[in-house]
Amino acid sequence: MQLSPQEKDKLLIFTAALVAERRRARGLKLNYPEAVAYISAAILEGAREGRSVEELMSYGTTLLGKDDVMEGVPEMIHEVQIEATFPDGTKLVTVHNPIRLSVVPLVGSSQV
């Protein structure tokens, strides 16, 4: 199988994300590389499904909370950037502060 460097990178991300997903399912807290891979893979899949850049930027902040990761990890990840393939081409998706330190209720929601 002949893969381009970009395809190899995506396979590496998905492999790390699979490990992270399994560890999270067992109740283990994710470390830095696992958290980044978990978020990146979700963004790549969302792009493949046809979601917009704006949707994915927002979605990326809902995937993990501070209770899902090891101590110090939220402060280490200021942003996650991933080049994703959309139906209309490749675009860079940036998720700022992907792991929220506290949950802020959405305006107009019933969450308090």
From Swiss-Prot:
Its main location: cytoplasm. Gene3D superfamilies: Urease, gamma-like subunit. GO terms for biological process: urea catabolic process. CDD domains: Urease_gamma. Keywords: Cytoplasm, Hydrolase. It catalyses: urea + 2 H2O + H(+) = hydrogencarbonate + 2 NH4(+). GO terms for molecular function: nickel cation binding; urease activity. Belongs to the urease gamma subunit family. Heterotrimer of UreA (gamma), UreB (beta) and UreC (alpha) subunits. Three heterotrimers associate to form the active enzyme. This is Urease subunit gamma. The gene is ureA.
